Regions:
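Bacterial Sec-dependent N-terminal signal peptides
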Residues: 1-21
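Compositionally biased alpha-helical segments
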Residues: 19-152, 161-174
């Protein structure tokens, strides 16, 4: 009788030990099982179950985290759905490379204003940003990692005194 109770206690202890694994659910449907070490501003640092090395995932790639010990569910980010060019306003520009960790790199894109235009420095910048976001939306990518932001004004631009804004980035998706 004592052996049966001991075996039952060991089996229950094993199940409880396994149940304390944190589960990270990504927006693309993948789940990652391990131990969340910490949640930073743009990233989540975790260790895979049975490993000691720390891994990093950007928060934009993560839907939620279910903590194994407490059972608490933490919603990290909502999924951004960009299906047509009309969804360009939903596109997010990332300025920190670590925020793109865990997302799939798509292609390099560019948005710019014309050489001769009637934009001020600020409105030209907004126009270039809009074109950049529209390019990302056209290929179905909700994120852009900004790689270059160049503005030329006056005689350095085109010799005609106009201004031109050029923004380049890498488009990312889930």
């Amino acid at each position: 009788m004592k052996k049966i109770i001991l075996i039952a206690a060991l089996i229950c202890g094993t199940f409880f030990a396994k149940a304390q694994v944190d589960v990270i659910t990504k927006h693309n449907g993948e789940t990652v099982k391990g131990k969340v070490v910490r949640v930073d501003e743009y990233t989540v640092i975790f260790k895979y179950d049975g490993e000691d090395s720390e891994n990093v995932l950007g928060k934009y790639a993560i839907e939620k985290i279910v903590y194994g010990k407490s059972g608490r569910v933490e919603d990290v980010t909502e999924k951004i759905v960009v299906s047509t060019e009309d969804d360009w306003e939903k596109v997010i520009i990332l300025e920190d490379k670590t925020a793109a960790t865990g997302l799939k790199k798509s292609e390099e894109i560019r948005g710019k204003t014309g050489l001769i235009n009637y934009h001020t420095g600020n409105s030209g910048d907004k126009k270039a940003e809009k074109k950049l976001k529209m390019e990302a939306a056209k290929i179905g990518c909700p994120f852009i990692l900004l790689t270059a932001d160049k503005s030329t004004v006056g005689s350095t631009s085109n010799g005609l005194g106009g201004s031109q804004n050029i923004k380049k980035g890498i488009a990312y998706k889930y």
